[in-house]
Swiss-Prot record:
The species this protein was found in: Saccharomyces cerevisiae (strain ATCC 204508 / S288c)
Subcellular localization: Cytoplasm; Nucleus
Entry annotated with the keyword ATP-binding: yes
UniProt record similarity statement: Belongs to the GLYK kinase family.
Designated name of the protein: Probable ATP-dependent kinase TDA10
Gene3D superfamilies (UniProt xref): P-loop containing nucleotide triphosphate hydrolases
Major location (coarse): cytoplasm
């Protein structure tokens, strides 16, 4: 039974407070990854930041903890314009958002630094990029400076809406939804899955947010954009937000249900939380793999 008095944050803290100490007890020196995945506006960014603060308060005196969103690795605005031209007939890759619109070289460089942090004693920090979604009238651009994190990194939190989505093997897996513009997106998704959640070198805990109606994303994303505009004075119009979310729906329809059923985001354990339109928890599942 789901305890309706508990919030998403309550369940997430309980989960991590169980598995993180167990991880440290193993004496493993490689970084522990914490993957957050959930639809846009579901609260994964808010929750992951709260978890970062919780872990900093609990372990920050003795452990190095990093936090990033997959959004922070978006292509620069200039490079996104080049991608727009390269895939000018693919509506899903026109603008940031989907697999294929991130700087994979930068992501790999950051991951390599985190993984090899014991091999370079002369390097004491890793720089995590930051992305400003309000630039260029909501099209966004990378910030000129990033965030420095002390090496070696003990815990690295990464959140993103498609983390854990597994690409379809064309010719082997039959899926009527894998057509048109989604063929390119699916092909690019392999790079992410191989580098992150399917990477056998990464030891991870997964937290998954799912919902009873994927159309909740429209309302959530509008709420987010209104909050952004109130803070910085610029952002997307409601019509732009709706069109923006439309580009994500083919991916949700193709990957989301299988991903949620698999409960496999974390290589060690995965917590899956079902939330309604008000972000109240209506179901919980925990799967321990290791």
């Amino acid at each position: 039974m789901c305890d309706k008095s508990k919030t998403v944050l309550d369940y997430t803290i309980e989960f991590l407070d169980k598995y993180i100490p167990e991880w440290f007890e193993t004496g493993n020196k490689c970084p522990l990854f914490i993957f957050f995945s959930g639809p846009q506006g579901s609260g994964k960014s808010f929750t992951s930041i709260q978890i970062y603060n919780h872990l900093m308060e609990k372990y920050g005196g003795e452990k190095s903890i990093g936090y990033a969103s997959i959004d922070d690795f978006y292509l620069t605005h200039e490079d996104q314009l080049k991608l727009n031209e390269q895939f000018k007939n693919n509506k899903l890759l026109q603008g940031r958002g989907l697999p294929g619109t991130h700087d994979m070289k930068l992501l790999q460089e950051v991951l390599n630094t985190i993984f090899n942090n014991n091999e370079h004693p002369d390097q004491d920090t890793v720089v995590l990029p930051k992305y400003d979604k309000s630039q260029f009238k909501g099209e966004g651009d990378r910030c000129p400076t990033g965030q420095k994190i002390k090496l070696p990194v003990d815990i690295f939190i990464l959140e993103g809406w498609f983390l854990g989505f597994n690409p379809i093997l064309q010719g082997i897996e039959n899926n009527d939804l894998l057509t048109g513009d989604m063929v390119d997106v699916n092909a690019k998704l392999f790079f992410y899955s191989d580098l992150l959640w399917r990477n056998p070198e990464i030891k991870s805990l997964g937290i998954v947010f799912t919902t009873d109606n994927i159309n909740n994303v429209y309302g959530w994303r509008l709420q987010q954009e209104h909050e952004l505009i109130s803070k910085v004075g610029k952002g997307m119009t409601d019509e732009q937000v709706h069109a923006f979310v439309d580009r994500y729906m083919p991916s949700y329809k193709l990957y989301l249900n299988d991903f949620v059923r698999s409960e496999s985001l974390g290589s060690i354990a995965t917590l899956t939380l079902g939330i309604d339109s008000n972000r109240n928890v209506y179901s919980t599942k925990t799967r321990c793999i290791e």
